[in-house]
Each structure stands twice: as C-alpha cells, then as structure tokens.
C-alpha cells in the first residue's frame, strides 16, 4: 500500500545553501522532518545551480519520512539574471529598468517549460514576456 501524504511544504531556497536556520528549519520542524537529512540532500542535489533560488515541494508522509521535488527557478529570477539587474521596477508601467531580447526570453521559456502550463514554446514565451513587462523590462527583437 502506498504511504499516505500527511503534509506538503513549499519553500524557495537558494541552491546549495539550505541550512537549519530560519526559514527552512522552522518550516520543516513543524512538519516533523529530519532537518539535517533534508538540508544535506537538497544541497547535494542543487550544488550545480549555485546562485539560483530553487522552489522545492516536500511531501511529508505519516511515518515522518519525506520526498521532495525541485522545480526550475522562478521566471523573475531568470529574467533578472539575463538582464543583469538586481531588482525589477517599482512602477513598471512608468519606469523601465532593463531590456531583454526575444532570444533570452526563448531560452528562459525552454528552461521553464517542464514547470509551465504551456502547450508549446511560443505560449511559454508569451508567459515569460508578460512576467518581464510586469517587472518593468522591455522585450526587444
């Protein structure tokens, strides 16, 4: 018989830098997970993606064992890295802070494809372009 999922914990943690300190420790402690076991496994699995923020979904089972799935970094993080800026615009409709090319958008869309609810790369690109515009970025050809 399959183990029953007791709780789902969703976190966004910098790749390779999970520590028992907040916010990771308290979130996992409340779920009853072995914090050191998770941090070691997460850091080993994400060591090659240093500098990125990795969303992770942790499934906690009734016997307090757990499994986790790492997702692709958020589109906003990938866009900021591609544009070389620290943060998006506070007023995206008035102030544009950076420009990204269609090629960069396509690369990000292909990276995000497994996590996006899109049928093809073109629709994924439109989603990423919308995120870019809402951050105050200009998309150019």
Swiss-Prot record:
Cellular component, GO, one term: cytosolic large ribosomal subunit
Annotated GO biological process: translation
Record PTM text: One or more lysine residues are methylated.
Gene Ontology MF annotations: large ribosomal subunit rRNA binding; structural constituent of ribosome
Gene3D superfamilies linked: Ribosomal protein L11, C-terminal domain, Ribosomal protein L11/L12, N-terminal domain
Keywords: Methylation, Ribonucleoprotein, Ribosomal protein, RNA-binding, rRNA-binding
Annotated family: Belongs to the universal ribosomal protein uL11 family.
Biological role stated in the UniProt entry: Forms part of the ribosomal stalk which helps the ribosome interact with GTP-bound translation factors.
Subunit structure: Part of the ribosomal stalk of the 50S ribosomal subunit. Interacts with L10 and the large rRNA to form the base of the stalk. L10 forms an elongated spine to which L12 dimers bind in a sequential fashion forming a multimeric L10(L12)X complex.
Protein name (database record): Large ribosomal subunit protein uL11
Organism: Streptococcus pneumoniae serotype 2 (strain D39 / NCTC 7466)
Lineage of source species: Bacteria, Bacillati, Bacillota, Bacilli, Lactobacillales
Name of the encoding gene: rplK
């Amino acid at each position: 018989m399959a183990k029953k999922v007791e709780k789902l914990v969703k976190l966004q943690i910098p790749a390779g830098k999970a520590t028992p300190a907040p916010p990771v420790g308290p979130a996992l402690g409340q779920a009853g997970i072995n914090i050191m076991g998770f941090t070691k496994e997460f850091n080993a699995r994400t060591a090659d993606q240093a500098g990125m923020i990795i969303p992770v979904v942790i499934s906690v089972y009734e016997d307090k064992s757990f499994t986790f799935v790492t997702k692709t970094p958020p589109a906003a993080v990938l866009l900021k890295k591609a544009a070389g800026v620290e943060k998006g615009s506070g007023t995206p409709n008035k102030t544009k802070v950076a420009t990204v090319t269609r090629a960069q958008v396509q690369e990000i869309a292909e990276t995000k494809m497994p996590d996006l609810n899109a049928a093809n790369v073109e629709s994924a690109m439109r989603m990423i372009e919308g995120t870019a515009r809402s951050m105050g970025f200009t998309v150019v050809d």
